[in-house]
Amino acid sequence: MEMDSHNAKPLRILLSNDDGVHAQGIHALADELRSIAEVTIVAPDRNRSGASNSLTLEQPLRVTEIAPKTFSVQGTPTDCVHFALNELMKDDLPDLVLSGINHGANLGDDVLYSGTVAAAMEGHFLGVQAIAFSLVGKQHFESAAKIARQLVEQHLIRPIPTNRLLNVNVPDLPFEELGEIEVTRLGARHHAENMIKQRDPRGHDIYWLGPPGKEQDAGIGTDFYAIEHGFVSITPLQVDLTAHESLRAMDSWLKEEN
C-alpha cells in the first residue's frame, strides 16, 4: 500500500453505494483502490437505489461486519455514511468518501433521486471530500474503477481544488476506448413517463414507476453530451439549493401593493 507523503499515514477511503454491500460495482472499486489505500466498505444490506438522502428515523440501524472492514447496514445509503463517519470512524475520519460504482448512470436530474450521489453528499455534509461514481451500463466496472483510482492519485498530488461534491459518470466501454475526462454541467430530462398499472394475483391494482424521461437538455457542455460522445463526465455539485437570482424578485413581489 502506498503512503500519503503529507502525513506518512496510509490513505484511508470509505466506500458506500446504493446497490448494496454485495454489488459488483463497489467491490470492483475496492479491489482497484486497495493497493493505494486502506479501504473500509459500509453499504446497505440490499439494493436501495432511488433512496436519495433519506435517513432511517423510526427504527435502529442494524450493522453486521460480514468481512474484514466490510459492514452491511440495514438502512439507506445516507444512513451508511452517517454511521461510518459519526460512529465507526469518528476518531480517525477517512481522507475520502467514494460512492459507487453505481450500476447505471446518474446524469442530469437523476442526482436528485440517486442514493449513490446521496451517500457522497452525506460525506460532504460531514466534512470529508466526496465523489460519486456511476457506470453508464453494467459491464465494464473495471473502467470506472480505473478512472476512480486515477482521480484519487491525482488528488494526492494536487488536492481537488474545490470542496464541492463531485459526480462522475463513466461510459460503459473498455478502459482503452474511453475519451478524456470532461468537466460538465448537469443536463436535464423531461418528466418521467406514465405509471404502469397492473393487477396482482389477488385482483388488487398495483403500480410501477414509468421509465425515466428522455433527455431535454443534452447539449454541448452537459453530462449527457459527454457520455454520448464517449467521454468521462465529472460535474461539481453544490448542496445549497437556493435560487439566488430569484431572491430580489421574490422580495419585490412580496412588497408590492395589491
Swiss-Prot record:
Binding positions (a divalent metal cation): 18-19, 49, 102
SUPFAM superfamilies from the UniProt entry: SurE-like (SSF64167)
Cofactor note: Binds 1 divalent metal cation per subunit.
Catalyzed reaction equations: a ribonucleoside 5'-phosphate + H2O = a ribonucleoside + phosphate
Subcellular localization, as worded in the UniProt entry: Cytoplasm
Listed cofactors: a divalent metal cation
Keyword annotations: Cytoplasm, Hydrolase, Metal-binding, Nucleotide-binding
Coiled coil: none
Any one Gene Ontology molecular-function term assigned to this protein's record: 3'-nucleotidase activity
Taxonomic superkingdom: Bacteria
EC number: 3.1.3.5
Keyword Cell inner membrane: no
EC top class, as a word: hydrolase
InterPro entries: SurE (IPR030048), SurE-like_Pase/nucleotidase (IPR002828), SurE-like_sf (IPR036523)
GO CC annotation terms, alphabetical: cytoplasm
Principal location listed in the UniProt entry: cytoplasm
Keyword Metal-binding recorded: yes
UniProt cross-references to NCBIfam families, sorted A to Z: PRK00346.1-3 (NF001489), PRK00346.1-4 (NF001490), surE (TIGR00087)
HAMAP family in alphabetical order: SurE
Function: Nucleotidase that shows phosphatase activity on nucleoside 5'-monophosphates.
Family as reported in the entry's similarity comment: Belongs to the SurE nucleotidase family.
PANTHER family named in the record: 5'-NUCLEOTIDASE SURE, 5'_3'-NUCLEOTIDASE SURE
The protein's name in its UniProt record: 5'-nucleotidase SurE
Gene name in the database record: surE
